[in-house]
Every structure is written in structure tokens, then in C-alpha cells.
Amino acid sequence: MKRFPGAAALALVMAAFGLAACHGDDDGNNNGSGSQNNALPNFISGGVRTQTYDGTTDDLLTAGLGKDGLASATPPAISNSAAPSAADLRRLAIYSNYRALVDMSANGGYGRFWGPNVDLNGNDTLGEGMIAGKEYLAFADDGSGTLNVSLLVQIPASFNPDQPCIVTATSSGSRGVYGAISAAGEWGLKRGCAVAYTDKGTGNGAHELATNTITLIDGTVLNAVAAGKTSVFTANLGSTNLAAFNAQFPNRYAFKHAHSQQNPEKNWGANTLQAIQFAYWALNDSYGTLNGSTRQIRYKRGDVTTIAASVSNGGGASLAAAEQDTQGWITAVVVGEPQINLSVPSQVSVRQGGLAVASFGRPLADYMTLANLLQPCAALAPAAVGAPYLSTLPLATTASIRAARCASLAVNGVVSGGDVTSQATNALALLHQAGYQTDSDFLQAPMWDSQAVPAVAVTYANAYTQSSVADNLCNFSFGTTNAVTGAAGVSPAVSPMPTVFGNGNGVPPTNGINLVYNAGNSGAADHRFATADASFFGAFCLRGLWTNGDARMTASVNAIRVNANLHGKPAIIVQGRSDTLVPINHASRPYAAMNKLAEGNASNLSFYEVTNGQHFDAFLSVAGFDTRFVPLQYYNLQALNLMWAHLKSGAPLPPSQVVHTVPRGGTAGAAPALSVNNLPAISASPGANAITFGGGGVNVPN
């Protein structure tokens, strides 16, 4: 892998590498003023690495695995498991992240509606789908080495310099820099666009405290002291505090999103804009005219058609970037299931079928801590009977946890009812009152059983309170545990660190690092086993941070709220009505209403609400998901194509609407193959399915 050195050494190697010897302004001088030399943006720290891929032995989209390799249940081999190479880790990261965001089953649509072999028209014409091109990788930082936001630009060999385009692929969740490769990167590469990725300053930065081991930008590991400012993340402890913590809490891990103490979410819009600016620099480095040994600027700000695209909180970051962009970096926005925290004006209202919804516009800190508290109990409500089972635990163990959680909720006055059934029914009713759709009833159990909700609740509570790993917020920590008893503090047979870049998602439990409750009945343990009620008092404490108005959490949440003013940019939001991780009443519905209120007739936002759509397409092959729910990926791709036609040929965007899909049905675990009959197109004339706006309100037809 070729590495461009940082600014301090650039002058010494300018001739060899063809780079300007100085950084430019924050926008990389691509604004039509100042020097015409292609200078690195000032926020780039530590130099730029580049690598070219031939599209045969290795490539941008599949890391040489191709369609079949990505579909294989067997991860790609690592040549040296104790010290994987950067190339092996990149391949593993692309494999893991691609599979994490889409349904990889053939019956579920992989290879037919999406996948490396499927072209932009939805046809199986691309074979294994490998894409040749070049990658640029660098950190964005302020010089302290504590931000170290990973930025990655992929430029496919099919890029047409006379028709330039950029698609952003901001990572979803707390994933690494390849986190949105299947959600947005793939479409951009097939379109011949440069793809601008960022990990948002959260991506998979792990610190193994017992050995003081961290990850570098390419996923390889190093001692934290030796790494210094080149570490993706090093916990802010100091040697004395680190030793004391390790003595009391052995075999624990700090993670960047949870423990950076920086509330990284406040920068996600800016990080997305930085990725775009870095992409401009990379395009100029590739296609700018050479003046001696220096590249000239070919593309200035606004010269490149740029679509901000991603899903989940990557989608939220894209919206935040578009709101913050007053200089013309972003042309349009296409996002799926955006996780966003809203500053809701008093005029805004949300209705479904003409009736006011129970609650809307709550921030994640509110609804996630509530769901984490109530979901195990709500899973026993009669309305949730038959929900998909998404846990590796024996069903009897899960049933016991659920009943015990109901009992603890009742004793502590959170739910009412004299028996488990009535307590569970009340827990589900409380979720409905908090804005969760009845369409989500079958998903309350798997969202908790999969540990998605507990993981997010703990990580974000730490982030919002800007807690140190040493704080053990609400007695939670991250650590390796005994596979049978769940006891924490055990030394792992194999450290998770060498492969955390490739396998991890940045939010424990991940890659063998589990969510631990330190105040268990028999000591620290996996939160599900620490107490009979699955660490109820820890969950109760997390909830109390919000309900009691913890000042740190309140300030952090206020710092990340968005206003929905996209400055007239054409935009599309797609979300599933059944979303139970990011409830639609707290995300897309009120955001769309706020946008129409903020922009009035200047608004160019279309919102498509998909029935039978939920947050995790990767779950759709699981029994009970396959029969009930449809893939949002299909509509995300359709939305990107609609936006492209709008930008390039002036085709009008279809108006906001509900898309009524048809579940596959059949037998759980053996649903019939997905077909176009399940997936009606977004309509140019939605008629009675149109979503309407007025006076700050949105009305979504049933």
C-alpha cells in the first residue's frame, strides 16, 4: 500500500508523489479562490494512503471475493490469524459490512434484486461484480490525534472525468469506514461515481485495556503508547489509572463511540462534508492537470454532482450534512431509515389516517433507554406471541428472563398488573404510548433478544454523558466472558483485537467482546445472566439518566438536534413503517413535517413510507422475518435511481407516499422467493396513498 506522508514531510517527496507540499483551506481550495494547486484540506492528518485494485485479484466492492464470495457463509481466510495483514483485514471488513446491511439469501433477493452481479437496471449482467479502481485513505483530525475520523474515497475505473459524480457512504451504526458499502457504496461505484466514506469518528475503535492494544487506521494493532496519535482510539486514562482499572476490572475494553468523551455524534454532519471535500481532493489528484510535479485543481466546489446517501445514523449524518451545507458541496440527499434527533417546533404534528399519533419526535436517548427497559417484558404480551426468535439462548432461558424483567418492572412501579400477562400487556402499551407502532409488536422481542437495543442503549448513554470507560456508567462495561456461565473477567483464549476491524461493528457485543453488568449477583457477568432479570437495575439507571434530566446527557442531545432545513436540496427519505430500532414517529415522519414547515414551497423532499419494512434487512432470512417483512434495500436503490433521473434528466421526484408492500408469507424459515409482486414501485401518482402536509403537520394514510 502506498502512503502519502503528512504535510511536514510533503516537500521532500513532492516530486515522487505528485502532491502539493502544503495543506489548503478547510475546503481544500476547491472553491474557486486562492491557489489552483490541489492542496490537501487542512483537516487531513498524518498523510494519505493509496492503493489501486485491478478488479480481478482484488477490487473496490468485494475485495476480490466477488458475488459468490460475499454470499458464502464462510468468511475469507486470514493468512496469519495472530497478526492479520491490512489486506486481509480490509477483505474481512468488506465481507462483514456488506453482509450486515442486506439480505444475503437468494430467496430474499440477493443476486436477483441487489448484489454485485445486478446492474443499475436490476438485471443480472455483471457476473461476479468486481470493480477496479483506486482507494485513498486518511484521518481527519484537529492535530490532537483524539478525533482521527477515518475518511476513504473509492474512485472506480469507470469514473468519467467529464461527467463527475460523488456518492457519500457514511457508515451506519458505529461501524468502520466500509460500513455502508452495500447500502450506498455499491450503487455509487456501479454508477461510475467516486464514493466518499467516513466512519464518523466512531468506527470500531477498540482499546484492549489489559494489554494496552489499539487499532490503527488500516485495522492492524499496536501498543497504544507506541501508536501515539496514529491510534484510531486510545482511552483517556493514563498509566496509573489504567493499571488501577485493570486490577479491579480485568479484561475490559474501551470503544471509541462509547468512551471517546467527545459526543462524536455532534460532528457527524461535518464528518460527511469532510469526506466529500476529501473526495474532491482525490479526484483532482487523479484527474487534475500536472503542472510540473503538482496537480492542478480541475473540480471546484459545486462542479461535481454529489448525492449524500446512507442508512440509519449514516442517513442521519447525511441529513445533518445537507442542513449544514450552505456552500454547495451537496447536490441532493437520499437516505434510508435515518436516525436523527429533532428540534421540533411547536407547530409540528404527526397523524396517521387523520388521527394524532401517541408521541413523536423523541430523541434516541429517550426512546432507546425506554425500549431497553420494557422490551423483555413486552415480549410476553399476547400481541407479541409468535414473534421471530433471534437469540442463541435456549428459549426457556429467554422466557425466564422475560418473566423476571416483568416482575422487577412491576415491583419498581414501572408497569402495572398482578400477573405476567397483564404486566407484559402494560409494557407493550407503554411502548405504544411512547410512539412505537403496533406494526412493530412482533419486533419488540427480537430487537432486545438480538442485543441490538441493549447495545445501542449502553453505547449512546456513555457517549451522551461523555463518560470514561473507568466510569462504568450504570455498572455496565465491555469485556470477554465465559461462554457457559457468562462470568466476566476471563482472559480470552484468542484476543478479539487482531480481527475487530474486520469483524466488529463498534457496539459491543461484537467479535467476542460482550456487554457486561458489573453488579451481578455473583459478580460481573454478561448482562443477560448477571441477574435473573437481565440486569434490570442497570437498564433502570440508564433510563433514569434521561427521565431525571442528567445535565451531560441533556446538553449532548441538544448539541446533535437537527432542524430539517435542507435549503431546497432535492431529497428522498425511505423508511419502513415497522421500524423498531428507530421508530418512524421519532424520525422520518416528523422530519418531513419539519422540512415542509421550514422550507415551505421551496421544499424538494419526498418521503416514502414502506409498509412491512423494518430496520435490519440482514435479519430477513431469519424464520418469521422472511414471511412478514420486505427489504428496504430494494426501495433505497429505487430512490437512488429516481434521484439520479431527477438530477440528470429533470424527471420529477414522485410525491411523498405510503408504499403498500406484500409480505412473502408461507412457512416461517421457508418463505417463497421474493418477487416483484411483493414490491410495488414507488408511484408517480400515489392517489389515496399520498402523504400530505400542511401547517406544520404530516398526515400519513393507513
Each language-model region and where it sits:
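Bacterial N-terminal signal peptides that target proteins for export
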Residues: 1-9
